[in-house]
Structures are given as structure tokens and as C-alpha cells.
């Protein structure tokens, strides 16, 4: 049976946990929430999810992370899971990163940290 998943990616553990708590309180209990603290871990989770026959319906990623940045991760994921919505979070306004994500990752939304629950 195909299960829907949401993937939250941020190098700060507290941020992914806060996202997970907000999502659990806002979405169907049928949707599984996965978390990753690096882009590399996120790619592994996506590959494992697809191998299991499940699907990622939404990716929420921080922009500024060590190693691979959020906009590069989202662009890679757009090639693997183009149907997934992609949201980028950042505490820093980097218009070049946002433009890159819009043009290369089909960015659905950009949210400034700290976010409001309505975001």
C-alpha cells in the first residue's frame, strides 16, 4: 500500500522537531512525517521511500545548511520526485537562492524563519 510522506530537512534538530510537531497537529494522521538533518540524509530517505513504494508529497527544506544548500537539494529532488511540492525555509534573505529554487526546483513557496503557524 502506497503511503504519503512529508520530508522536513534542516541542519538544526530543534527546527525539524518543531516542524514535525506543527505538521502532526495540522494534517491527516495517515501522512508520515520524515525528518533529516542534512541534504545527504534527505536524499537517502527519498530513495528508501521510493524503494518501499511510498511517495513524498511535500518537502520542506532549510536553505542554508552545511554541505549541500537547500536550493540545490530541492533542484535534485525535483528531478527525482517532480510531483512533490517544495517549500524552502530560511532565516536569511538570499534572493539568488530563491530565484535558483524557483527556476530549477519548481519551488512552491518560500517561508521566512521564524514562521507563523498560518504559513
Predicted feature residues:
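Conserved phosphotransfer cores of two-component systems
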Residues: 48-54, 77-83, 104-105
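Alpha4 helix (beta4-alpha4-beta5 surface) of REC/receiver domains from two-component response regulators
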Residues: 72, 93-110, 117
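Two-component/phosphorelay signaling modules centered on CheY-like receiver
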Residues: 8, 13-35
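Active-site residues of response regulator receiver
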Residues: 10, 62, 90
